[in-house]
Amino acid sequence: MPVFHTRTIESILEPVAQQISHLVIMHEEGEVDGKAIPDLTAPVSAVQAAVSNLVRVGKETVQTTEDQILKRDMPPAFIKVENACTKLVRAAQMLQADPYSVPARDYLIDGSRGILSGTSDLLLTFDEAEVRKIIRVCKGILEYLTVAEVVETMEDLVTYTKNLGPGMTKMAKMIDERQQELTHQEHRVMLVNSMNTVKELLPVLISAMKIFVTTKNTKSQGIEEALKNRNFTVEKMSAEINEIIRVLQLTSWDEDAWASKDTEAMKRALALIDSKMNQAKGWLRDPNAPPGDAGEQAIRQILDEAGKAGELCAGKERREILGTCKTLGQMTDQLADLRARGQGATPMAMQKAQQVSQGLDLLTAKVENAARKLEAMTNSKQAIAKKIDAAQNWLADPNGGSEGEEHIRGIMSEARKVAELCEEPKERDDILRSLGEISALTAKLSDLRRHGKGDSPEARALAKQIATSLQNLQSKTNRAVANTRPVKAAVHLEGKIEQAQRWIDNPTVDDRGVGQAAIRGLVAEGRRLANVMMGPYRQDLLAKCDRVDQLAAQLADLAARGEGESPQARAIAAQLQDSLKDLKARMQEAMTQEVSDVFSDTTTPIKLLAVAATAPSDTPNREEVFEERAANFENHAARLGATAEKAAAVGTANKTTVEGIQATVKSARELTPQVVSAARILLRNPGNQAAYEHFETMKNQWIDNVEKMTGLVDEAIDTKSLLDASEEAIKKDLDKCKVAMANMQPQMLVAGATSIARRANRILLVAKREVENSEDPKFREAVKAASDELSKTISPMVMDAKAVAGNISDPGLQKSFLDSGYRILGAVAKVREAFQPQEPDFPPPPPDLEHLHLTDELAPPKPPLPEGEVPPPRPPPPEEKDEEFPEQKAGEAINQPMMMAARQLHDEARKWSSKPVTVINEAAEAGVDIDEEDDADVEFSLPSDIEDDYEPELLLMPTNQPVNQPILAAAQSLHREATKWSSKGNDIIAAAKRMALLMAEMSRLVRGGSGNKRALIQCAKDIAKASDEVTRLAKEVAKQCTDKRIRTNLLQVCERIPTISTQLKILSTVKATMLGRTNISDEESEQATEMLVHNAQNLMQSVKETVREAEAASIKIRTDAGFTLRWVRKTPWYQ
């Protein structure tokens, strides 16, 4: 099957596929319509010459390379493409003699498919060799990083730095060139992010090594902390480089990124459970411990973390952990209620406390078992991935020693571990059967090699068979590991709501549990938010969570009994939909308030830690103050991370922002203990310049990361809501200050005034970011003016607060302070108003009917229609434009003979134009009728401004019936999104609706419904045309959008569409060559279908996201823009 994960491969395969599509159509015309196939001798001869050149250059490459895998994998690809070319030549010769020959048509279609598949195999094999070159450089850096452990002198450090620099530069250059070549945006982003992290960590590594060498050589205190800093940095850089190596080897969408994240999440949950257990047990043992104190909160946190772990499990494990959490939560509520009534020492309460204590131990054991299983399966999977390269190298080398056999045995051992942990017997048996086959084949190959027959045809065939079996075994183990994990809901709130809504609308359809998983995720986040709230607010949010939980369970129960469409189910679905809206609104309100509180000041704790670390050695209580501030800093960092995660989970962020928040939270958790270690080194070595510089490096890295986190959190929540919450919080702080003055409490006053100043500065930061993000001059001026006014009010308030604190009983000073506080409130209100959307100016009301009267004059007659005029003819469609082969840029490394030969094949395919003049002329001379309109560009003659919104053709897509065809399901998903809006005056919506209909048609064609090869190929072309229209219009909207962030999001989404639509055309051609053929294996046909399905789903999703981003961008369109789109909801949101 063709793969096109690089731009070069895609650009070569596209014209080849385009011409093969014409051969497919010719074949079908001859087979179905009985038409003669024109003489193809000339174009086939040109392709034969290009293929021969490609093979010749490939063989020369094989002879000169030292890459054993390339030497092994190239020859089969040569044979494949040469055989296909031979069939094409044979077909051309037979058709020249008999244009109606049936065997010739068979050779034509099989040869066409083989040319495309064989060329793809050649390019992929060569590309894999290029990737191995990059990986070798990466592994060289990995090995050199371990040398950091033996650097103990400054001379060694200087040498190490000089040697590391060039290698890092080379790796960075190769990674940058590679990411530009990739077609998958996700892979590009992963490579860039990991490489940027490595670059950022390089100065940290040098700093950590320097302080280690300094402390060791001077025998100073803090050598253990220095060692931790160095080892942490080495491990972090190694992990990122290993991630680069993993991503480099991906040729399809990455579906395995969950493994390390889930393992980390479970370990973090277990660590937190362990840290809170003593506090929780202490509260349970003390019958007089009050409800709601730290001990009860510890129990809630344990249950919360265990619930997170349970959500990462599947099947029986999941049910047991979540069920235990729920039961213990209810028992804790009952115990708290008994103690609140003064009955904590009664036998019933004591028994309840003991049961909860035992239940916590049982719950912890279940989470530990789940974590061990996940880690074991993940480790085995990763071990197989690491060992398979060495095994393949051994198989490729006819003279390889026994060490390669050990690698194969190691792979089999890890696969056996996965099989033992499988819950599904069929999967387990399948893996074990593969292990038996590989063992027998490997023993046979080893025997041949021991007898000096390793280079014999039999041994080579065995090696190839084992290599294929190992790849299949890896796929089976990967699938088995993935199947032990639960279905994943979307990572952001809107995605979860959409998934939940789809299930609520159609609970009888099998969505693999995604909809219910989304609802569970929303409820879990709601309960996590409730845990940090107090009093009636907590109970209110928990009640909303319970309500959603109950309704979802009732609907699922009815669906399981086959009553998902009953009136009772419809009523419950409506209630569930309303309850979800209520829960979402309450969650976002609670989250915004928490962000306003926790992120009002992000850097003061680390600054106080720096002051404590640099305090003179004779400062009283120096150690105690440092430890207190270090603990405060760690708690503060933990709160920031937890709040940021909540903002990501229930905010309005898109997937990119959510993943960005998660990455910064992870970095903050890793960096925080390293900052404390660096501070402790400085504390124990006062005046040490190296220690000071190292602490500053770590501190600045932590601050930069938190600033990035803060910006992403601000993106994730509505700015207006954040400003409202901040304004309300300032009012409460001002009220506290009034109470403090009334009670003569200067410390309380200072705390309140400090909080007001921090919140005001936070508002200034938010406003500044929004000004930088906008290109709307009016908005920028309004926000900047309001921000400047607010900025001027903060210092006077602080000065007045200090004056009152010095003489708190002075009424005049109190009045001055309150006036300053009210001025800040007024300025904050003006900033908020600057973000308020302008209300439209409504026209004046119509006059009273009493004052209206009708005249006796008749309306003027209707003008006559023009006579004798004929509408102008429709202009001819534009010629298909072939993609140019990407020009080689100066300094690029892709100048190998292999690529030059591929370029020649590309050029030959282009010469064989989509409407070949020679073929048409020869056909015309032979009296053959060729319909040129078959290849005409599709024309959408119905402009969107006159399109009827009823759109009866959409009724072809049943929306309330179970859909088990993934392409049709993807089309319906886009269709639902597009039909929210009227297509009148909105070409993006019109094009999206056409794409949905075309994709529904493709679903029928791919699954063997009505239609033929030509219809499938034409359908893919039509989809590509509509895709180009969506992309063009989206870029026009982006160009006029004044919001930089929204514009970037829109461009990132829509730029994926052309690549995916091009791939759709190629895959449709491949699938068309298989329709109706009996010499195609079921496995090969299914593989082609799976690739086409995956591509179609990605295209529909990208267009759907483009529609959403375009609507958001249209709100921020330039007022003087000539380009406008009407966004009119068919069903308003308030209905």
From Swiss-Prot:
UniProt subcellular location: Cell membrane; Cell junction, Adherens junction; Cell junction, Focal adhesion; Cytoplasm, Cytoskeleton
Domain of life: Eukaryota
Chain spans, region Linker (Pro-rich): 836-878
Assembly and interaction partners: Exhibits self-association properties. Interacts with APBB1IP, NRAP and TLN1. Interacts with CTNNB1 and this interaction is necessary for its localization to the cell-cell junctions and for its function in regulating cell surface expression of E-cadherin.
Region spans: C-terminal tail: 879-1135
Region (Facilitates phospholipid membrane insertion), start-end ranges: 1004-1047, 1121-1135
Protein encoded by which gene: VCL
Protein name per Swiss-Prot or TrEMBL: Vinculin
Primary location group: membrane
InterPro entries named among the record's database cross-references: Alpha-catenin/vinculin-like_sf, Vinculin, Vinculin/catenin, Vinculin_CS
Membrane topology: Peripheral membrane protein
GO CC terms: actin cytoskeleton; adherens junction; brush border; cell projection; cell-cell contact zone; cell-cell junction; costamere; cytoplasm
Region (3 X 112 AA tandem repeats) residue spans: 259-589
Biased amino acid composition, Pro residues: 860-876
Family according to the record: Belongs to the vinculin/alpha-catenin family.
Post-translational modification: Phosphorylated; on serines, threonines and tyrosines. Phosphorylation on Tyr-1134 in activated platelets affects head-tail interactions and cell spreading but has no effect on actin binding nor on localization to focal adhesion plaques. Acetylated; mainly by myristic acid but also by a small amount of palmitic acid.
Domain free text: Exists in at least two conformations. When in the closed, 'inactive' conformation, extensive interactions between the head and tail domains prevent detectable binding to most of its ligands. It takes on an 'active' conformation after cooperative and simultaneous binding of two different ligands. This activation involves displacement of the head-tail interactions and leads to a significant accumulation of ternary complexes. The active form then binds a number of proteins that have both signaling and structural roles that are essential for cell adhesion.
Source species: Gallus gallus (Chicken)
Cell membrane found in the keyword field: yes
A GO molecular function held by the record: ubiquitin protein ligase binding
Residue positions, PTM Phosphotyrosine: Y100, Y537, Y822, Y1134
Annotated tissue distribution: Isoform Metavinculin is muscle-specific.
Effect of Y160F: No change of phosphorylation levels in platelets
Sequence repeat start-end pairs: 259-369, 370-479, 480-589
Keywords tagged on the record: Actin-binding, Cell adhesion, Cell junction, Cell membrane, Cell projection, Cytoplasm, Cytoskeleton, Lipoprotein, Membrane, Myristate, Palmitate, Phosphoprotein, Repeat
Annotated stretches, region: Disordered: 837-888
Outcome reported for the amino acid change (mutating Y692F): No change of phosphorylation levels in platelets
